[in-house]
């Protein structure tokens, strides 16, 4: 029998083992679609971004005009820009759902896969932040000023670090140039880390909704899950295209239609919606260094999740008390996101502080305590 090139060719063999003959648990649900959707969410901004970079000018006097030029004069420039900007929003929607699924079903016990995933999230956040600065509107400029200024809270080296990042004594032309360079580079770094992420995943195989070992019951990825992923991609592309074509500025800030002006501060400086939960946690602490530490902890706390797993069951499928806690955490994150978009005044200050406190309390204390209690109830006999 002639050898199958798909299984013998050095390069095709890798693709085959990752996407075609990959043994997958037969019972994984639609929640397992988001990994492949994230791949699509990465490819789309890279392709549109390369096309935008051909027309964009990374100079403070020309950046705003070059974005307007792309939207007005470049063939389908408006479409490329809208797909690129809203692609970031859908990237974050997918990654948050992907993390939520990993948390709910105990996938974090694959520690290497989980940790590389968090590194991917941090890299994505950095990419989105530097990208938001590039149109050089009011919110771009002031967002960059406020967020980079947070590094000055670091003792001893803070101020030097900020001036080094700025390339001067304020956010100016050198800052914009280096942010453009970073925004071009980081998505390719994300693509590289994604391969590492997948390599670790394929070492152990996928988790499943029951959280049990499924080696005895696996099916090939293609055609079963490739078809399922295709459906997921179709269902994701509908709201994505609807947003990009009908209401492309829905998730943006109106302030960004005004060119950057260092002499006029916007009434309410806020980041894009996907950072609002962390921004609310930052603002809830009246001390600068404390706020920065809380901001860092709000994301870095994910590294501690595998260490805080006390349950004898992996998944939350059969753990109703933990399920209630999980959905409380989700509701809490929605509250933080909403508070982050509101001005700093009563009652939003106290709501933000209570939501921030409950965020850390749920993750660090209530989940391990509940898991221990469930062990007692479930395994008492």
From Swiss-Prot:
The keyword Magnesium does not apply. GO terms for molecular function: metal ion binding; ubiquinol-cytochrome-c reductase activity. PROSITE patterns: CYTB_CTER, CYTB_NTER. The chain crosses the membrane at residues 34-54, 78-99, 114-134, 179-199, 227-247, 289-309, 321-341, 348-368. Coiled coil: none annotated. Heme b b566 binds at residues 98, 197. It is found in: Mitochondrion inner membrane. Keywords: Electron transport, Heme, Iron, Membrane, Metal-binding, Mitochondrion, Mitochondrion inner membrane, Respiratory chain, Transmembrane, Transmembrane helix, Transport, Ubiquinone. Its cofactor is heme b. Heme b b562 binds at residues 84, 183. One of its GO terms (cellular component) is mitochondrial inner membrane. Binds 2 heme b groups non-covalently. A ubiquinone binds at residue 202. One of its GO terms (biological process) is mitochondrial electron transport, ubiquinol to cytochrome c. Heme 1 (or BL or b562) is low-potential and absorbs at about 562 nm, and heme 2 (or BH or b566) is high-potential and absorbs at about 566 nm. Component of the ubiquinol-cytochrome c reductase complex (complex III or cytochrome b-c1 complex) that is part of the mitochondrial respiratory chain. The b-c1 complex mediates electron transfer from ubiquinol to cytochrome c. Contributes to the generation of a proton gradient across the mitochondrial membrane that is then used for ATP synthesis. The cytochrome bc1 complex contains 11 subunits: 3 respiratory subunits (MT-CYB, CYC1 and UQCRFS1), 2 core proteins (UQCRC1 and UQCRC2) and 6 low-molecular weight proteins (UQCRH/QCR6, UQCRB/QCR7, UQCRQ/QCR8, UQCR10/QCR9, UQCR11/QCR10 and a cleavage product of UQCRFS1). This cytochrome bc1 complex then forms a dimer. This is Cytochrome b. The gene is MT-CYB.
């Amino acid at each position: 029998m002639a050898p199958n090139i798909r299984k013998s060719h050095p390069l095709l063999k890798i693709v085959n083992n990752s996407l075609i003959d990959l043994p997958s648990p037969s019972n994984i649900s639609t929640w397992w679609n988001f990994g492949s959707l994230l791949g699509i969410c990465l490819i789309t901004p890279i392709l549109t971004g390369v096309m935008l970079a051909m027309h964009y000018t990374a100079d403070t006097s020309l950046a705003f005009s070059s974005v307007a030029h792309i939207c007005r004069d470049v063939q389908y420039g408006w479409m490329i820009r809208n797909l690129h900007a809203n692609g970031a929003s859908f990237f974050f929607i997918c990654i948050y759902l992907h993390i939520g699924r990993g948390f709910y079903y105990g996938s974090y016990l694959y520690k290497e896969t989980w940790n590389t995933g968090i590194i991917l999230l941090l890299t994505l956040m950095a990419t989105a932040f530097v990208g938001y600065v590039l149109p050089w509107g009011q919110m771009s400029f002031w967002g960059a000023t406020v967020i980079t200024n947070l590094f000055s809270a670091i003792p001893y080296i803070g101020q030097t670090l900020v001036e080094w990042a700025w390339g001067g004594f304020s956010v100016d032309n050198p800052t914009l140039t280096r942010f453009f360079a970073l925004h071009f580079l980081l998505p390719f770094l994300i693509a590289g880390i994604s391969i590492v992420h997948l390599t670790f995943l394929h070492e152990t195989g996928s988790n499943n909704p029951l959280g049990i070992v499924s080696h005895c019951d696996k099916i090939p990825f293609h055609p079963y899950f490739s078809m399922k992923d295709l459906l997921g991609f179709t269902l994701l592309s509908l709201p994505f295209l609807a947003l990009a074509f009908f209401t492309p500025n829905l998730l943006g800030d109106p302030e960004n239609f005004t060119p950057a002006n260092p002499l006029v501060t916007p009434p309410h400086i806020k980041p894009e919606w996907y950072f609002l939960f962390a921004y609310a946690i930052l603002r809830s602490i009246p001390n600068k260094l404390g706020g920065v530490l809380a901001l860092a902890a709000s994301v870095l706390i994910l590294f501690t999740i595998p260490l805080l797993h006390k349950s004898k069951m992996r998944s939350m499928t059969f753990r109703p008390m933990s399920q209630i806690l999980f959905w409380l955490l989700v509701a809490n994150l929605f509250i933080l996101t909403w508070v982050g978009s509101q001005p700093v005044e009563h009652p939003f200050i106290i709501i933000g502080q209570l939501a921030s406190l409950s965020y850390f309390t749920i993750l660090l204390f209530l989940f391990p305590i509940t898991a221990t209690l469930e062990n007692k109830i479930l395994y008492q006999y």
